[in-house]
Structure formats: structure tokens, C-alpha cells
Amino acid sequence: MADHGDLGSDLREQLSQLAAFLSKTDAGEIFRALAGQAQHDPAVAARFASEVVARQRERDRAPFLQARRRGQLAEATDIDLAIDQLVGPVYYRVLVTRQSVPPAFTDALAARYLAQPARGSTAGEPTSGGSR
């Protein structure tokens, strides 16, 4: 992903690319099929998590790490929570409701995240593996 020098621009591009990948590409169709199969097959789930989801998670982290290096994001920001807030609705639309994910939707997700006072900073809350 390109570094646009601005967290908002980077997030809009990342979310737009994710939505297009999941809903408009052959690879996205395979991703959706594997995600479904992973719900029923522990071996597929383990491999899907380690080989596919982990790589996607690193791509999702890129805009935040770039922003942190530029001084646009506080060290205390919970990046994992921010990713969940941003990409969760995209996955939900594609995998659960089968709704389209237009640029206006992904742009609105980025804008809402950026409008949060602490930009996802949640001192003391678990980032993953904790109870929700």
C-alpha cells in the first residue's frame, strides 16, 4: 500500500482495496469460501488463520504503523482495536449480509474513526484474545 503521508488517505485506500478484494476478485471469492469452510474444519481454520488472516492483518496494520512513524498516531493507540472497528463492517457486509461495499461506505468508516477523540486509544482494554 502506498504511503500518502496522511492517515485518513491511507485508511480510505486500505479499506477500499479490502472491499474490492473481498467482493470483486477471484481471490476474494476463494477467501470467502475458505472463511466459510474454516467454520467447520479445524485444520482449515488453523491454516487459514496462520497463512491468510495473519498476512491480511499485517496489511491492515500498515496505515497505522506509517502514521505512528509520522507522529500522527499516539503510541497508546490500540491498533488492533482500530483495525477491528474499521474492517469489521467491511467483512460483515461481504460475508454476512452480502451487501455492496461502495467507496462512500469505506470513506465514512475512515471518517468516523478519525473523528474519535482518542483515535482508538483504549488503555487497559484487551486488544485480542480477551473477553468481548
What residue ranges belong to the model's regions?
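Amphipathic alpha-helical interaction segments
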Residues: E13, E29-A33, L81, Q85, ...
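All-alpha amphipathic helical-bundle segments outside canonical DNA-binding/catalytic cores
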Residues: R47-V52, R69-D84, P103
